[in-house]
Curated annotation (Swiss-Prot):
Belongs to the IspD/TarI cytidylyltransferase family. IspD subfamily. It is an enzyme of class 2 (transferase). It comes from Acidobacterium capsulatum (strain ATCC 51196 / DSM 11244 / BCRC 80197 / JCM 7670 / NBRC 15755 / NCIMB 13165 / 161). This is 2-C-methyl-D-erythritol 4-phosphate cytidylyltransferase. Signal peptide: none annotated. Keywords: Isoprene biosynthesis, Nucleotidyltransferase, Transferase. GO terms for molecular function: 2-C-methyl-D-erythritol 4-phosphate cytidylyltransferase activity. Gene3D superfamilies: Spore Coat Polysaccharide Biosynthesis Protein SpsA, Chain A (3.90.550.10). Catalyzes the formation of 4-diphosphocytidyl-2-C-methyl-D-erythritol from CTP and 2-C-methyl-D-erythritol 4-phosphate (MEP). It catalyses: 2-C-methyl-D-erythritol 4-phosphate + CTP + H(+) = 4-CDP-2-C-methyl-D-erythritol + diphosphate. PANTHER family: 2-C-METHYL-D-ERYTHRITOL 4-PHOSPHATE CYTIDYLYLTRANSFERASE, CHLOROPLASTIC. Pfam families: IspD. The lineage of its organism: Bacteria, Pseudomonadati, Acidobacteriota, Terriglobia, Terriglobales. The record marks 163, 219 as: Positions MEP for the nucleophilic attack.
Length: 239
């Protein structure tokens, strides 16, 4: 069994730029405690012995820049940089097309801008995929969740969803390679776009299990997220 990791990193980071006074650059290039966010993410997966290779999908005009970072931090033997697409789904699909896998192999998909994923959680996700064929990291809901209907007057609550039925999906999301390929092929044939890989796999009829996540496995999206991530990182270093 081999484990391949796909890191979609072709986003523009428009939400981060909207609230920032600094010159705009994609989130994966921002520095967290002096090291690019993407490099923190690569380090976490490189620390897991089961991981065979990582594929980073970036915008075509950023391939050279990312490859230079990969080389600078010594990941060139384990990381490939490929051209992504205009959406997350396109980027993952293009990266997946470069993976030569067999029936026993596993593919993990992880947001490049979740730099604080812990190697132990990655390992547990791999174990869960070995058992069930599909698993994601999820964080149990702590707030009361309301279902709403959008109207001209604003959002109207239509139901309260019990928290025990809710998890906030995180990454990595892992699948047997052939299952993920089939899910992407069916989605493309039907013109379906999902917000994550699990939604495509669910649609293909497979059951997806959940591995407990952590609040520190945050996605850097908004201004202020870098400061919070730095706090988590310093806290982890002081253990």
């Amino acid at each position: 069994m081999r484990v391949f990791v796909i890191l979609p990193a072709a986003g523009l980071g428009t939400r981060m730029a909207a609230g920032s006074h600094t010159p705009h650059q994609p989130k994966q290039f921002l520095e967290l405690e002096g090291v690019p966010v993407l490099i923190h993410t690569l380090r976490a997966f490189a620390a897991v012995p089961a991981v065979s290779a990582m594929i980073v999908a970036v915008r075509p005009n950023e391939i050279e820049r990312v490859q230079a970072q990969v080389n600078e931090y010594g990941f060139q033997d384990k990381v490939r940089v490929v051209a992504g697409g205009d959406s997350r789904q396109q980027s993952v699909s293009r990266a997946l097309a470069t993976v030569e896998c067999d029936a026993s192999d596993i593919v993990l998909v992880h947001d490049a801008v979740r730099p604080l994923i812990e190697p132990a959680v990655i390992a547990r996700t791999i174990e869960a995929v070995e058992k069930s064929g599909a698993a994601i990291v999820g964080l149990p809901a702590v707030d009361t969740i309301k279902q709403v209907e959008r109207t001209a007057a604003g959002a109207i609550i239509t139901a309260t969803i019990p928290r025990e039925y809710i998890v906030q999906a995180q990454t990595p999301q892992g699948f047997r390679c052939e299952l993920l390929r089939r899910a992407f092929a069916e989605a493309e044939a039907d013109g379906f776009t999902g917000t994550d890989e699990a939604s495509l796999v669910e649609r293909a009829g497979a059951q997806v299990t959940v591995v407990p996540g952590s609040p520190s496995n945050m996605k850097i999206t908004q201004p202020g997220d870098l400061e919070l991530a730095a706090f988590y990182l310093r806290q982890r270093s002081s253990r």
